[in-house]
């Protein structure tokens, strides 16, 4: 709700909405919000009356993401520019002709205010539940991808179509010039899955056995999914204990290949679990 309120404030500042927003779940950083964002980026010294409200929203966006700008008055100064630059670098926005370092364009604002960021940005990695054949792997390579995430176990859909990676598929992926990273997800779509923290130990064991079976190299990171948006207290109460059990299992003698545990989920959840030192 806090993040959505930021998008709502942006829409009000842009003039996209002039009415009181009574349901934040209806707020979306869509085409209208994107089109109304200034063509000229927010930047150091850009402090006219038109930009002050937008600068202020960017300042709160920085704060929400852990980059305290030190002020919330809408004045874009060199300190704020430094925080924007650090945010852009950490979230992989630089070096792909998407942003100007230290300036807030619409892509940076999307990343500040939404978990998914700019969905139109280029990417080097993807994931899929489809068992890839040779042509599909080549298509991904030709589309500019270099890494593909694939699932170690499970099925998808009401017809339970297998989604787990196979040895033949690995050959197809590698022959196309792609690298593959393993994902474990046999649940995790809703909070109830995480309410018993020992589920983490069960999932850790299942993932390690599956990785060993198909020859995943020692030391590889296996990504465990949290596939829904959590409130902060839910992360503390349920997600952290779940990953604590994963971490404990991965650090035990049963992890003979010394695989590492990673996390795959919303930005805040990933950051919080990482801050606890439970994932690599």
Per-region residue spans from a language model:
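Cell-envelope/ECM-targeting effectors and their regulatory/trafficking segments
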Residues: 1-147, 151-153
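Generic structural signal for well-ordered alpha-helices
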Residues: 137, 170, 204-208, 240-247
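Surface-exposed substrate-engagement region within the catalytic domains
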Residues: 210-216, 229-280
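Substrate-binding cleft of extracellular glycoside hydrolase catalytic domains
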Residues: 157-230
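Structural recognition of the beta-strand scaffold that forms the well-ordered cores
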Residues: 61, 123-127, 146-151, 179-184, ...
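Solvent-exposed loop/turn segments at secondary-structure junctions
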Residues: 130-132, 147, 153-158, 186-191, ...
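Surface-exposed patches in mature extracellular/periplasmic domains of secreted proteins
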Residues: 19-23, 70-73, 96-100, 151, ...
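Anion (oxyanion) recognition and catalysis
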Residues: 141, 174-177, 251
């Amino acid at each position: 709700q806090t993040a959505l309120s930021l998008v709502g404030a942006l829409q009000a500042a842009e003039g996209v909405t002039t009415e009181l927003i009574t349901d934040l779940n209806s707020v979306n950083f869509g085409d209208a919000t994107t089109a109304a964002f200034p063509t000229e980026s927010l930047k150091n010294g850009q402090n006219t009356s038109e930009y002050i409200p937008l600068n202020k929203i960017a300042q709160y966006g920085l704060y929400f993401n852990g980059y305290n700008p030190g002020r919330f008055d809408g004045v874009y100064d060199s300190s704020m520019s430094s925080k924007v630059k650090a945010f852009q670098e950490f979230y992989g926005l630089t070096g792909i002709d998407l942003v100007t370092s230290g300036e807030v364009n619409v892509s940076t604002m999307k990343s500040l205010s939404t978990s998914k960021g700019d969905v139109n940005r280029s990417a080097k990695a993807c994931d899929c539940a489809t068992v890839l054949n040779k042509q599909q792997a080549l298509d991904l390579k030709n589309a500019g991808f270099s890494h593909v995430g694939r699932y170690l176990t499970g099925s998808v859909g009401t017809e339970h179509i297998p989604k787990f990676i196979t040895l033949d598929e690995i050959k197809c992926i590698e022959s196309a010039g792609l690298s593959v990273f393993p994902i474990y997800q046999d649940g995790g779509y809703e909070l109830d899955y995480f309410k018993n923290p020992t589920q983490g130990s069960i999932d850790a064991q299942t993932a390690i056995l599956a990785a060993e079976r198909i020859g995943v190299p020692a030391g590889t990171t296996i990504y465990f999914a949290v596939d829904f948006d959590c409130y902060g207290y839910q992360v503390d109460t349920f997600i952290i204990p779940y990953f604590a059990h994963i971490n404990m299992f991965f650090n035990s003698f049963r992890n003979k290949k010394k695989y590492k545990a990673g996390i795959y989920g919303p930005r805040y959840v990933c950051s919080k679990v990482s801050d606890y030192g439970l994932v690599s």
